[in-house]
């Protein structure tokens, strides 16, 4: 999942971004509303952590523009991060399109829990554990299991599997995976996605269990619930 942190306090922005990256998310940072809108115009984000009080374009206006952008469907989830704690401020943020509202100062574990909760809404689940076939992913404890056996995954492999499991059965192009699992510093001209999918696929191969990730020729990859290729899908 790819996140955008919009915060004009540099130390706080970097601390939040570092914590989110340590949890396996791809994170970009914007220091003000104008930079945030520039990044939102070029990149697809799953969630935006958005400060309200910023010089120039404030967070409320950024949120309104996110919600008015009809070219993004779905538009990213928005988590407001602000020192404004009055009822009126919270209502204004939610009415302008925020999905959740967290008052500063906050404990990072709570921020992380709220991020997971918002992203679960798009995955259609109410718990921190994702399940596809005999594959289980505990996003809170960072534990991946298949057929009751623990899988040793790197942070990027875990993030990639999490994205697959929140989009089961969907064909995901390399461009889509690069956009949502890697940050803006990833080189789009490398074979990073193909290599990471390949290593993840090998780690998911437990015993005689069927392969869960198919290559759909000319289109991308798909996580199936039984490992059977569909249509023009062929394993690679």
Segments predicted by a language model, with ranges:
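Short, Lys/Arg-enriched segments at the junction into DNA-binding effector domains
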Residues: 2, 117-171, 175, 226-229
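A short linear beta-strand->loop->alpha-helix hinge motif most characteristic
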Residues: 211-236
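Nucleotide second-messenger and two-component phosphorelay signaling modules
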Residues: 71, 123-127, 208-210
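N-terminal/domain-start alpha-helical segments
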Residues: 1-122, 236
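Residue-level recognition of specific faces of alpha-helices
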Residues: 53, 65, 77, 83, ...
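Positively charged, aromatic-enriched patches within helix-turn-helix-type DNA-binding elements
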Residues: 143, 148-155, 159-212, 217-219
């Amino acid at each position: 999942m790819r996140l955008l942190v919009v915060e004009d306090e540099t130390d706080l922005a970097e601390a939040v971004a570092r914590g989110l990256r340590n949890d396996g998310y791809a994170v970009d940072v914007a220091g003000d509303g104008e930079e945030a809108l520039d990044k939102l115009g070029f990149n697809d984000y799953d969630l935006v952590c958005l400060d309200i009080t910023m010089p120039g374009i404030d967070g409320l206006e950024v949120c309104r523009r996110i919600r008015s952008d009809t070219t993004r469907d779905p538009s990213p989830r928005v988590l407001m991060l602000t020192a404004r704690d009055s009822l009126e401020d919270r209502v204004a943020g939610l009415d302008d399109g925020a999905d959740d509202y967290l008052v500063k100062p906050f404990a990072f574990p709570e921020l992380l829990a709220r991020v997971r909760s918002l992203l679960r809404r798009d995955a259609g689940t109410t718990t921190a554990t994702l399940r596809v076939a005999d594959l289980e992913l505990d996003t809170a404890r960072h534990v991946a299991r298949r057929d009751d056996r623990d899988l040793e995954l790197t942070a990027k492999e875990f993030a990639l599997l999490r994205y697959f499991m929140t989009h089961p059965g969907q064909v995901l192009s390399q461009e889509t995976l690069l956009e949502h699992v890697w940050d803006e510093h990833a080189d789009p001209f490398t074979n990073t996605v193909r290599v990471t999918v390949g290593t993840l696929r090998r780690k998911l191969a437990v015993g005689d269990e069927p392969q869960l990730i198919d290559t759909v020729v000319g289109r991308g990859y798909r996580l199936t619930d039984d490992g059977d290729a569909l249509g023009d899908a062929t394993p690679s």
